[in-house]
Regions:
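Residue-level detection of beta-strand-connecting loop/turn positions
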Residues: 1-2, 189
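Short, surface-exposed charged micro-motifs
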Residues: 38, 144, 182
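Transmembrane beta-barrel strand/turn architecture of Gram-negative outer membrane proteins
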Residues: 23-26, 43-71, 151-228
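Residues embedded in well-ordered regular secondary structure
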Residues: 3-16, 46, 54-170, 208-209
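Charged docking surfaces used in two-component/phosphorelay signaling
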Residues: 29-31
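A contiguous binding-surface segment within folded domains or other stable secondary-structure elements
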Residues: 9, 20-23
Length: 229
């Protein structure tokens, strides 16, 4: 819910993302008067109600669920392979592909302040854009403990999610640790229900850099700049 943020232009995300999917028992959509009656005017457009799992009468059990996912860039823009580095004429800069025709001759490149100039063939580098990105990896682990009788019951769940995106050097990462505890107790004519949730997220966001990548000279291998000094 970002309604409190006014017109700041900031999106603080969706609280539903903080819920471990393994904890979800059901998702219910409330509409109209029923939603407003329960949650007030803020629910005039409806409510998405997420119910987490609750223990029943069952023996003590411990379960584990895990998944691993890999992601890659599907496709990138095709770049021209006729003209090389420069702006109308050849230039030592690393961006701009409006220079002379590529002819395979040896050219200097990089900063003109280098004591020892770097050289490379004035040739088109294949797969330059695609090779900039890395394979994104995500692993998700959940451990749950359940136990219940007619009188008491408990469900405890710990979840760990770690994701590294497709940007190099782990520039875009997401880590989330969740712990949830839900229990109940029946004492005489009284029923007690308790729930607790803890969430910690560490997020590193990176700019897409796609515009900068498109301006990169087609004859300069991006990998050669990884240790550039």
């Amino acid at each position: 819910d970002n309604s409190r943020n006014g017109t700041t232009g900031a999106d603080f995300g969706n609280g539903a993302n903080d819920i471990n999917s393994e904890d979800v028992e059901s998702v219910t959509v409330l509409k109209g008067a029923s939603a407003t009656a329960l949650y007030g005017s803020r629910a005039s457009n409806g409510v998405v109600m997420i119910t987490t799992k609750k223990a029943g009468v069952e023996k003590l059990s411990v379960t584990y669920d895990g998944s691993f996912t890999a992601s890659q860039v599907l496709r990138v823009m095709r770049t021209q392979d006729i003209f090389g580095q420069g702006w109308g004429s050849w230039d030592r800069a690393e961006n701009g592909s409006w220079g002379p025709r590529l002819d395979g001759t040896i050219h200097e490149w990089g900063s003109d302040k280098l004591e020892t100039p770097m050289t490379k063939p004035f040739s088109y580098v294949k797969h330059n854009l695609r090779d900039f990105y890395q394979t994104g990896l995500e692993q998700n682990h959940t451990v749950s403990l359940r136990y219940g009788t007619e009188a008491v019951g408990i469900v405890a769940t710990y979840g760990n999610l770690n994701s590294t995106g497709i940007m190099p050097n782990d520039a875009d990462t997401y880590a989330r640790n969740t712990f949830s505890l839900r229990g109940y107790a029946k004492v005489n004519k009284f029923n007690f229900d308790m729930s607790m949730n803890f969430v910690r997220k560490d997020i590193r966001r990176a700019e897409s850099m796609y515009m900068e990548l498109l301006q990169h000279a087609v004859d300069v291998d991006m990998s050669s700049m990884s240790d550039y000094n």
